[in-house]
UniProtKB/Swiss-Prot annotation:
Alphabetical list of InterPro entries matching this protein: Aldolase_TIM, Indole-3-glycerol_P_synth, Indole-3-glycerol_P_synth_dom, Indole-3-GlycerolPSynthase_CS, RibuloseP-bd_barrel
Protein family per UniProt: Belongs to the TrpC family.
Gene Ontology process terms (BP): L-tryptophan biosynthetic process
CDD domains to which the protein is assigned, alphabetical: IGPS (cd00331)
Superkingdom classification of source: Bacteria
Name of this protein: Indole-3-glycerol phosphate synthase
Catalytic activity, as annotated: 1-(2-carboxyphenylamino)-1-deoxy-D-ribulose 5-phosphate + H(+) = (1S,2R)-1-C-(indol-3-yl)glycerol 3-phosphate + CO2 + H2O
Recorded name of the encoding gene: trpC
Length: 278
């Protein structure tokens, strides 16, 4: 019997979590909360507008920890990080809400969104319509659908629920087979290519470059994971990739927003700042 991969372990726990949550708060209660939530801010629209100008469309991630690296950021105040990212030029935010493997929380998404005007994606392992409605109830503007975690029927169902509640969808792929499934099943304009293999957690930027020719021009390619320096950014930009999801490089910096500006907008110069987020 093979040893379960990281992703398989996460998904097994996620099924338990959904059962526990739905026992506490019913789907109909969540649907009422979703209807009462602030209007969506237009996640896809913001990214498409920025990338169309051939400017970096950065989804800046708020992430305390990961299964592969452990705790990434000790000084973790989501509201302050969100403000810092907005000041640094982020187009959107990504907030981890997975508790067991990423030390995330629903409250982190709410705190980050209230602190800024940027659209926010709920970064989690979505496997059930309950989580999609829950995301909108929390105030999310977009949800992540990971192809390696879903079959085609479930993927289509979750995307349909997202549309019904007013959420954009970012579909995430890692290889050619997943890309083919995503393009066949979903019409979302946002296609994220994760350079990290979710089974082994190994990272290679070649993943994005290899899949790029197979992605239709009417979809926006978002390169995810492994962007650590200017050379990585320039490698993508010369290949006409202008949308990025970056977390760890920012989370390890003293001021995440200044690091964002240094990495993506060096022509603006780096502002003088104290040791705290401001």
């Amino acid at each position: 019997m093979s040893v379960p991969t990281v992703l398989e372990n996460i998904l097994a726990r996620k099924f338990q979590e959904v059962a526990e949550r739905s026992a506490r708060v019913s789907l109909s209660e969540l649907e009422s909360l979703a209807k009462a939530a602030d209007a969506p801010r237009g996640f896809a629209q913001a990214l498409l507008a920025q990338a169309k100008k051939k400017q970096p469309a950065v989804i800046a991630e708020i992430k305390k920890a990961s299964p592969s690296k452990g705790v990434i950021r000790e000084n973790f105040v989501p509201a302050d990080i969100a403000k810092s990212y907005e000041k640094g030029g982020a187009t959107c935010l990504s907030v981890l809400t997975d508790i067991d493997y990423f030390q995330g929380a629903d409250a982190y998404l709410q705190q980050a969104r209230v602190a800024c005007s940027l659209p926010v994606i709920r970064k989690d392992f979505m496997i059930d319509p309950y989580q999609i409605v829950e995301a909108r109830a929390l105030g999310a503007d977009c949800v992540l659908l990971i192809v390696s975690a879903l079959d085609d029927v479930k993927m289509a169902e979750l995307a349909s629920v997202a549309k019904d509640v007013g959420l954009d969808v970012l579909v995430e792929v890692h290889d050619g087979d997943e890309l083919e499934r995503a393009l066949k099943t979903l019409d979302t304009p946002l296609v994220g290519v994760n350079n990290r293999n979710l089974h082994t957690f190994d990272v290679s930027l070649e993943t994005t470059l290899d899949l790029l020719p197979r992605i239709p021009r009417d979809r926006l390619v978002i390169t995810e994971s492994g962007i650590l320096n200017r050379a990585d950014v320039e490698l993508m930009e010369i290949s006409d990739v202008y949308a990025f999801l970056v977390g760890e490089a920012f989370m390890r910096a003293e001021n995440p927003g200044i690091e964002l500006q240094r990495l993506f907008f060096p022509e603006r110069g780096v502002p003088v700042s104290g040791s705290t987020l401001d």
